[in-house]
């Protein structure tokens, strides 16, 4: 079954990291995802730009500059993993969390998934 691991963090802390600090963090996270990738269980993963680059479109078509949610932690990225159980997905999130200094990872089963076309 597919699970999403949603990555929430304090945007100002994440985007204030130096290039070296960010590179070290991504390298640590890659050691975790390498295991999933080798097993053919790692799907798309991404990091979003800052919410200052966001535009919100409400139902009906109203467009608002910036993010809708005004919270300390923002959704900054996600992983899609193929796991046998919720427990396996949670364990994957635990391994990722051990490599982070703060933030929250939310594990949620995927109800519908369309990989779309290959983007480059």
What is each model feature region?
Residues 1-120:
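Conserved, structured core segments of small domains
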């Amino acid at each position: 079954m597919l699970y999403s691991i949603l990555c929430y963090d304090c945007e100002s802390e994440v985007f204030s990291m130096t290039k070296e600090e960010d590179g070290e963090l991504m390298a640590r996270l890659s050691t975790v995802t390498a295991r999933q990738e080798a097993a053919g269980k790692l799907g798309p993963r991404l990091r979003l730009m800052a919410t200052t680059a966001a535009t919100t479109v409400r139902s009906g078509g109203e467009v608002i500059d910036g993010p809708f949610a005004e919270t300390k932690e923002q959704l900054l990225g996600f992983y899609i993993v193929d796991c046998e159980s919720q427990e396996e997905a949670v364990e994957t999130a635990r391994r990722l969390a051990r490599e982070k200094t703060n933030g929250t990872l939310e594990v949620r089963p995927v109800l519908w998934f369309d990989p779309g076309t290959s983007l480059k």
